[in-house]
């Protein structure tokens, strides 16, 4: 076969593969953060992310330009603000989501209500679940998202940088929390009373800052708790995650319960940083300021 004929045959074969779809990106099979195996016929070109934290992680993994839909609150990085909003995590525009024709839906497993998950499953679209218990889980999650999107090299660079940033944070206690460690209640909202459990990055941040979350025995990111249970657990510190005017109202309400150690010791402090509640890579940068706020706090501190 002469060179010209060989070139013609090669071009013809390549054209056949392209037209038949066999030249598409290879299939993807991956285990997500929840341990579920996800299989896609090709690397996803269109991703819907139903969590602000998951959206931030996708950008870190190099897949931000694939995200065609997300939820209210997905404001980081800056480019995420340009993505179409599909409502919030518990009030989604399902018809619009389906119209976007995503190759995969990325959710934050522990922050997605079971009814929402059931509704998503009815769409018969692949669902990838993100799940972080602490900061140390974050680099691994980014690497997995890189494998999902086919952006492994970008994800690896980002994961290594994040490992360095996490290493610079105060360390978690290696053993059981010391008796002198102040016990803290984080008041995320008042009606209903939302706090954080062991599956929230704020729980990890509190530990790294030298305190202990009084609800760290709840294996859930953001549980609703009863006021009587808070009084029973009697925190040394109450950390309020609300704007100044709202936290002032909360402080006034707490003043009616002087039997609570934190109230008697006047260890009620306000700390608002959306990065920690969003739970993406920027949450790492919020930890030093939290530690600074908690530094003066101590267990059973006397009234000042």
Question: In which residue ranges do the predicted regions lie?
Answer:
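A short, structured surface patch at a secondary-structure boundary
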Residues: 45-100, 104-111, 214, 242
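Bacterial N-terminal signal peptides
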Residues: 9-20
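His/Asp/Glu-enriched short active-site or ligand-binding loop at hydrolase and phosphoryl-transfer sites
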Residues: 198-222, 242, 267-270
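Extracytoplasmic substrate-binding proteins
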Residues: 27-30, 36-37, 103-104, 108, ...
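Short helices/loops that flank or line small-molecule/ion binding pockets
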Residues: 94-101, 123, 225-234
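Boundary at the C-terminal end of the N-terminal hydrophobic targeting segment
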Residues: 21-27
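Short helix-initiation/N-cap motifs at beta->coil->alpha
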Residues: 31-35, 86-95, 111, 133, ...
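Bacterial N-terminal signal peptides that target proteins for export
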Residues: 1-11
């Amino acid at each position: 076969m002469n060179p010209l004929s060989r070139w013609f045959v090669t071009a013809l074969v390549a054209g056949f593969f392209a037209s038949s779809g066999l030249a598409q990106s290879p299939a993807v099979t991956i285990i997500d953060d929840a341990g579920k195996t996800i299989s896609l016929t090709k690397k996803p070109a269109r991703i819907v992310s139903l969590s602000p934290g998951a959206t931030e992680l996708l950008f870190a993994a190099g897949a931000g330009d694939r995200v065609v839909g997300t939820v209210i609150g997905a404001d980081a990085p800056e480019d995420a603000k340009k993505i179409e909003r599909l409502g919030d995590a518990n009030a989604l525009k399902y018809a619009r989501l389906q119209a976007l024709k995503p190759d995969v839906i990325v959710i934050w497993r522990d922050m997605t209500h079971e009814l929402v998950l059931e509704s998503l499953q009815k769409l018969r679209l692949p669902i990838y679940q993100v799940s972080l218990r602490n900061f140390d889980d974050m680099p691994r999650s980014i690497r997995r998202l890189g494998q999902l999107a086919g952006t492994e090299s970008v994800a690896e660079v980002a994961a290594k940088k994040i490992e360095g940033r996490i290493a610079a944070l105060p360390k978690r206690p290696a053993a059981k929390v010391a008796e002198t460690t102040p016990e803290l209640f984080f008041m995320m909202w008042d009606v209903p009373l939302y706090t954080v459990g062991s599956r929230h990055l704020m729980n990890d941040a509190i530990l790294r800052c030298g305190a202990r979350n009084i609800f760290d025995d709840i294996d859930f990111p953001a549980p609703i708790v009863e006021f009587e249970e808070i009084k029973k657990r009697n925190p040394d510190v109450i950390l309020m995650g609300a704007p100044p005017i709202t936290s002032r109202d909360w402080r006034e309400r707490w003043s009616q319960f002087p039997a609570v150690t934190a109230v008697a010791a006047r260890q009620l402090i306000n700390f608002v940083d959306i990065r920690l509640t969003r739970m993406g890579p920027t949450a790492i940068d919020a930890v030093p300021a939290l530690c600074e706020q908690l530094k003066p706090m101590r267990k059973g501190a006397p009234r000042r």
